[in-house]
């Protein structure tokens, strides 16, 4: 149905439930994608989330602070947190059993790893790659699959849905791969 004009929707659409599911849908997919790319995993098995409006009093329908933890079948947790009330920047690290990978500094260090197989500290470089948009447009022309195809998008969506539902209901949610469903539990 129709609704009355609201000028706030022109620039602040992301604050409303009928447009998005908040931080889980706007920011989490980028990091869930990185987790899949770097570890080779596909879908989280279950997750929890919480958050709330602790900073902004502007009529938003979504939390300004969000935290989710998801478990993956390979035996690790993905912990994502974001606060829109702090400009401290992003921090993305992977804490493995032999090393810590700091994606902000592009370094690998033995910090936090085991003593019997410590990683050699080193700086890593990113490989130059085309942007997602350039890759997508090239694939439209060539009829090839893009780097992030629909299957990868679906993997990210499962992480988003688990987290958003867990946040909204206060219940842990899990992914049933056989039926491709996210359910409480």
Residue ranges and their predicted role:
Residues 32-36, 69, 133-141, 154-157, ...:
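Non-transmembrane alpha-helical segments in soluble domains
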Residues 8, 128-135:
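Generic alpha-helical secondary structure signal
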Residues 58-61, 139-185:
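C-terminal helix-rich "cap/oligomerization" subdomain common to oxidoreductases
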Residues 1-48, 53-59, 90-92, 123, ...:
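Predominantly a Rossmann-like dinucleotide-binding segment in NAD(P)-dependent oxidoreductases
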Residues 41-49, 77-80, 101-104, 145-149, ...:
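Acidic/polar loop patches that form or flank catalytic/metal-binding clefts of enzymes
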Residues 58-60, 64-66, 71-131:
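NAD(P)-dinucleotide binding in Rossmann-like oxidoreductases
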Residues 27-28, 40, 61-63, 87, ...:
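Active-site-proximal structural scaffolding
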Residues 13, 27, 31, 35-37, ...:
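Tryptophan-centric aromatic hotspots in well-structured domains and transmembrane helices
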